[in-house]
């Protein structure tokens, strides 16, 4: 693996058996990896397929000439003891970010929230957010169970008979980076741990997926433009940072919803760096814009919020096609036992890392 580093459940109609199952998990983000780990611990054979060349999903981090950026999830909190138990398996990959609370500021950088936010620990991965999913993915990779650079474009299903019983058999049609089109087959169940719109597209490739696809009609997800800015000139004598004294803030600016000083996170390079997320509405309106145009507009908005108007030494933008959950499914997962299909992801109940 590249360690350096993009319906209500249907009524069951088939009986269960105690035999270990062969299960395909599509998507190697937090939800897919957590699902795969749990299934492996239960004794099943699991294979995870990820279209990108690295695991992580929306906890992806990217490297720039002056340090790394968490372009997806910025941090996470722990409110469920079950999630805490999972995190306890990789304690060396986490540190607390010194944000006791996160304030909200207007388009001019002035604080506008009236009440003090709830104070809770904001956790980040070390040396970046992607380190957590990479730690979970490494055992799968070493066991030959994680298949990177393999995009699932369709699924097919048939009923197999054996030992007096019938059971599901699923096949996945893959586009691989190294070997072209391939087929992976012999799966008893398929778990789709991908954004809801992607799940719908895959479910529609097999008639058995129609019920689950229909159940996702009310789920809404929005894109997000992410911008990264580097200011190595702030490392000069007598100058340690640029702009405001705060390190992260939500924003009501018409273009921007989140601003964070990346270099304030523990375990990061100290070169002044900022990560910015555009708000969902603006991102959706400009999802087809040229990246250069988006970069110019977001840089202008960033200057209005922070007062930093000097040109960065390095700047980039990235588009997340399905980044933010606007309307969740309303249940923690969906499972059609009669078809051998399941769905999971943060979009099932919310938009937080813990929801995955």
List where the protein language model places each region.
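A conserved short coil-to-beta-strand element within the FAD-binding core of flavoproteins
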Residues: 148-170
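N-terminal Rossmann-like FAD-binding beta1-loop-alpha1 element of flavoenzymes
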Residues: 21-49
């Amino acid at each position: 693996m590249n360690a350096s580093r993009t319906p209500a459940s249907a009524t069951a109609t088939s009986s269960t058996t105690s035999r270990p199952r062969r299960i395909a998990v599509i998507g190697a983000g937090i939800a897919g990896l957590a699902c795969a780990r749990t299934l492996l611990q239960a004794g099943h054979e699991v294979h995870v397929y990820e279209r990108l060349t690295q695991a992580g999903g929306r906890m992806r981090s990217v490297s720039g000439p002056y340090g790394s950026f968490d372009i997806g999830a910025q941090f996470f909190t722990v409110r469920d003891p079950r999630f805490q138990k999972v995190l306890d398996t990789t304690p060396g990959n986490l540190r607390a970010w010194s944000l006791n609370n996160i304030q909200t500021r207007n388009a001019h950088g002035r604080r506008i929230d009236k009440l003090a936010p709830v104070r809770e620990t904001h956790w980040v991965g070390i040396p970046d957010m992607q380190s957590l999913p990479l730690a979970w993915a490494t055992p799968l990779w070493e066991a030959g169970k994680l298949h990177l650079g393999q995009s699932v474009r369709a699924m097919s299903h048939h009923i197999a008979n054996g030992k007096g019983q019938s059971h599901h058999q699923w096949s996945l049609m893959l586009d691989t980076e190294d070997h072209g089109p391939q087929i992976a087959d012999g799966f008893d169940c398929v778990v789709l741990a991908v954004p809801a719109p992607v799940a719908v597209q895959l479910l529609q490739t097999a008639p058995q997926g129609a019920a689950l696809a229909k159940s996702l009609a009310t789920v809404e997800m929005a894109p997000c433009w992410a911008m990264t800015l580097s200011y190595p000139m702030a490392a000069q004598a007598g100058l340690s940072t640029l702009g405001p004294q705060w390190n992260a803030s939500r924003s009501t600016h018409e273009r921007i919803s989140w601003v964070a000083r990346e270099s304030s996170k523990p375990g990061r390079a100290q070169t002044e760096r900022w990560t910015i997320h555009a708000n969902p509405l603006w991102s959706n309106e400009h999802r087809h814009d040229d990246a250069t145009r988006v970069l110019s507009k977001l840089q202008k908005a960033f200057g209005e919020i922070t007062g930093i108007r000097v040109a960065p030494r390095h700047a980039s933008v990235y588009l997340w096609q399905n980044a933010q959950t606007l309307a969740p499914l309303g249940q923690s997962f969906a499972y059609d036992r009669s078809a051998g299909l399941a769905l999971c992801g943060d979009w099932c109940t919310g938009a937080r890392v813990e929801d995955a």
